[in-house]
């Protein structure tokens, strides 16, 4: 309906246009034929316009062909709207034939064919080959990236990567190809084969197998059960022994050792009662073991354990006790056993008893005192006191005074406790010896011995009582001295304490002390009143003549220069125990003296200034002298260029920037770039680090054994790559990593025939080049 309406509207418009165009285009006198042709033309235009409208929904109208008057063989009319005939329309007969089918196939093949492309140039083909080969190789190599990354990130690489399992050949194979050649080997093999010893380690020996064959089934089972039980018990005992061996408790091992010793002693007593001959043999074995211990240097404090304990003995009480036990063991082993005969025992009589009453420590101290080492006298003060009390009890106060002056600090109570313990042990030993000697000696000798032992015991009691009183009095003095002012401390002590000053250790004077003494002598030349000092010195010089000048020097050193002009008397005597400030001053002086002695023959300051002058001169820019002898004047041997010519051709260097250490006299700053240090500097942040402060922190952290433990030092300095000597390092295989290389047939085809490239390869080449 819409199409009809449009057609009517278009007809109306066309009629109006015709009416409008009549007076312009055509005259009234024109012929009717021309009008008809023009109408047909416009009508045809109108139909074409209508057919072009709404072509999608337009319905095809059936056209009717009319027979024409003139039929030409060259102008065949075709069905439909097409004006030209197609070859396919002519080939469509009523019935299909095979010949027409082949023609159709040929036509379809001709239609599918296109124009042949021009072949590529040789350069383009080679470039495509290179690109394809590069992409293929990169794809193959990219599969190794995880392996390479893993090896780079590893903390340590040990080559060869594959651990070769050692091939352990059984002993049968080894023995089959080996024969005994030397006579010793032949004898050993003959003995083994004679006794039917197995070459391997079977479960049962041939003897056991023969015994099993002779047994019944029940007996064999019982025997096997016994063997299993014995092996199980053996494994249990071995495991227990391993556990006990791992125990590090010294107390546990000491208890076990004592238990074993007691058990061995009981067994020896039982053996002595049952079988005396076997007991004698056992005693000989024990004596032989003791001789072996004496021959070895096990208890000489020269081993690694003893040295480590000696270092820690100052701080660790257990280490001190262990060292003491080892020393006592050494003394016990090195002591010679004196076996006296019966005649000597009868002749000795009372002399042996009297010698036994004297303690061994006194004899040792007396022997040491006569020896060539006088420095050992100070370490044996307690022993000398005991010897002095036994020789002359009246000199006891003097010896006590000497001992108190020499012992300092915390060592005093320890020495006193050791003395008391030693006294107690001596009493007990004396009591035992007296009990043993009562049965063997007559009554007369017994009385003399009892009287001698009573005297010794009384002396020891007096000694212990005096030590206790001295200890209490020293405590009271120490508490009272804390409240006494400094002036009272410097007052002269009574005559009984004179040995305290005499026993004070001497020290070498330093240069600073000599300077201070020089200053003090200047003050002394001014004739200051010193009556007290002179009086005290006059009293002491007759008693101790040789030590007087040394004491005078020490007393002068202890004088305070600030108190010289005061009315108070200067200090004469110092305390026996030095104060903390005095100890600190002495340490500083010793340190300075040590430095002076180390650099005694070196003028360090002068050498330093000379070195700095040389460094400054070397850093200054140098003048360039361009004078050439013989240019413009005579030249030769012995002739030098004139000064005028030198000034003319001398290029003076500009002054450089001021040095950083110009105003620092004690410092040399090297402004040159260190080539050796530059080799270790980095311009780019290394791989594992993500920020510069991480790298700086690792560089600043010391890795030496001085600042780290041994285990940390070894971990920090482990090499990146470790190779085992004697092993062949083979390259990594794809099968080891778990990757199999793909087939490269395409590349092989291209490389074999680069000139003949199929369409498939061309497409692949284009695709690879685009990618």
Swiss-Prot record:
Task: Please list the residues that carry the modification Phosphoserine.
Answer: 29, 31, 52, 77, 81, 405, 407, 437, 445, 453, 569
Q: Which gene encodes it?
A: UTP14A
**What is the protein name stated in its UniProt record?**
U3 small nucleolar RNA-associated protein 14 homolog A
Q: Name one Pfam family in it.
A: Utp14
Species per Swiss-Prot/TrEMBL record: Homo sapiens
Quote the tissue specificity entry.
Answer: Ubiquitously expressed.
Which Gene Ontology CC terms are recorded? cytosol; nucleolus; nucleoplasm; small-subunit processome
Can you say where in the cell this protein is located? Nucleus, Nucleolus
Biased composition regions of type Polar residues, renumbered to the chain? 535-544, 740-751
């Amino acid at each position: 309906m819409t199409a009809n309406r449009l057609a009517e509207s278009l007809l109306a418009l066309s009629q109006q246009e015709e009416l409008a165009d009549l007076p312009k285009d055509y005259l009234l006198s024109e012929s009717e034929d021309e009008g008809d042709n023009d109408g047909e033309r416009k009508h045809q235009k109108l139909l074409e316009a209508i057919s072009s409208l709404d072509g999608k929904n337009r319905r095809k109208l059936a056209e009717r062909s009319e027979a024409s008057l003139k039929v030409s063989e060259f102008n065949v009319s075709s069905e439909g709207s097409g004006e030209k005939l197609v070859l396919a329309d002519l080939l469509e007969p009523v019935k299909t034939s095979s010949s027409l089918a082949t023609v159709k196939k040929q036509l379809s093949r001709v239609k599918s064919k296109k124009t042949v492309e021009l072949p590529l140039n040789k350069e383009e083909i080679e470039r495509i080959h290179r690109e394809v080969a590069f992409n293929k190789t990169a794809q193959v190599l990219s599969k190794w990236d995880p392996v390479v990354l893993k090896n780079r990130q590893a903390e340590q690489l040990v080559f060869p990567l594959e651990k070769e399992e050692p091939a352990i050949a059984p002993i049968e194979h080894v023995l089959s190809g080996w024969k005994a050649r030397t006579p010793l080997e032949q004898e050993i093999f003959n003995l083994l084969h004679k006794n039917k010893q197995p070459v391997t380690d079977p479960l049962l020996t041939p003897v056991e197998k023969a015994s099993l064959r002779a047994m019944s089934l029940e007996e064999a089972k019982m025997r096997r059960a016994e063997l299993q039980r014995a092996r199980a018990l053996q494994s249990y005992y071995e495991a227990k022994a391993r556990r006990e061996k791992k125990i590090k408790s010294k107390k546990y091992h000491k208890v076990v050792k004592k238990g074993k010793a007691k058990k061995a002693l009981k067994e020896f007593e039982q053996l002595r009662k049952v079988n005396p001959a076997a007991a004698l043999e056992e005693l000989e074995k024990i004596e032989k073991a003791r001789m072996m211990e004496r021959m070895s240097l096990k208890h000489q404090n020269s081993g690694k354990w003893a040295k480590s304990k000696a270092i820690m003995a100052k701080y660790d009480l257990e280490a001190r006790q262990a060292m003491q036990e080892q020393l006592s063991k050494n003394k016990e082993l090195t002591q010679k056993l004196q076996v006296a005969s019966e005649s000597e025992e009868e002749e000795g009589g009372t002399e042996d008893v009297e010698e036994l009453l004297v303690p061994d420590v006194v004899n040792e101290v007396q022997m040491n005192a006569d020896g060539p080492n006088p420095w050992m006298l100070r370490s044996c003060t307690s022993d000398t006191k005991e010897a002095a009390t036994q020789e002359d009890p009246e000199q006891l106060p003097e010896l006590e005074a000497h001992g108190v002056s020499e012992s300092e600090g915390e060592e005093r109570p320890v020495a006193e406790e050791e003395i008391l313990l030693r006294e107690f042990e001596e009493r007990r030993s004396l009591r035992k010896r007296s009990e043993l000697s009562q049965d063997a000696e007559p009554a007369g000798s017994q009385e003399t011995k009892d009287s001698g032992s009573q005297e010794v015991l009384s002396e020891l009691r007096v000694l212990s009582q005096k030590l206790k009183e001295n200890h209490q009095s020293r405590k009271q003095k120490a508490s009272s001295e804390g409240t006494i002012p400094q002036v009272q401390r410097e007052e002269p002590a009574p005559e009984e304490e004179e040995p305290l000053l005499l026993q004070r250790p001497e020290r070498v004077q330093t240069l600073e002390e000599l300077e201070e003494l020089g200053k003090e002598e200047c003050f002394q030349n001014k004739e200051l009143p010193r009556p007290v000092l002179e009086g005290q010195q006059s009293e002491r010089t007759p008693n101790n003549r040789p030590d007087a000048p040394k004491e005078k020097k020490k007393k002068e050193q202890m004088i305070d220069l600030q108190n010289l002009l005061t009315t108070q008397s200067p200090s004469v005597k110092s305390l026996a125990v030095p104060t903390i400030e005095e100890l600190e001053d002495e340490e500083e002086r010793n340190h300075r003296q040590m430095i002076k002695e180390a650099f005694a023959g070196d003028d360090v300051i002068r050498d330093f200034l000379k070195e700095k002058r040389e460094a400054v001169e070397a850093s200054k820019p140098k003048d360039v002298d361009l004078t050439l002898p013989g240019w413009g004047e005579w030249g030769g041997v012995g002739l030098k260029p004139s000064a005028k010519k030198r000034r003319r051709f001398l290029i003076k260097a500009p002054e450089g920037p001021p040095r950083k250490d110009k105003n620092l006299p004690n410092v040399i700053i090297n402004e040159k770039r260190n080539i050796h240090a530059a080799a270790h500097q980095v311009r780019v942040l290394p791989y594992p680090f993500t920020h510069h402060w991480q790298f700086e922190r690792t560089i600043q952290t010391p890795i030496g054994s001085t600042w780290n433990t041994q285990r940390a030092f070894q971990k920090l300095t482990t090499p990146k790559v470790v190779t085992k000597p004697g092993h062949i390092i083979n390259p990594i295989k794809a099968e080891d990593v778990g990757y199999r290389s793909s087939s490269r047939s395409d590349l092989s085809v291209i490389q074999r025939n680069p000139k003949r490239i199929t369409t498939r390869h061309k497409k692949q080449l284009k695709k690879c080049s685009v990618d």
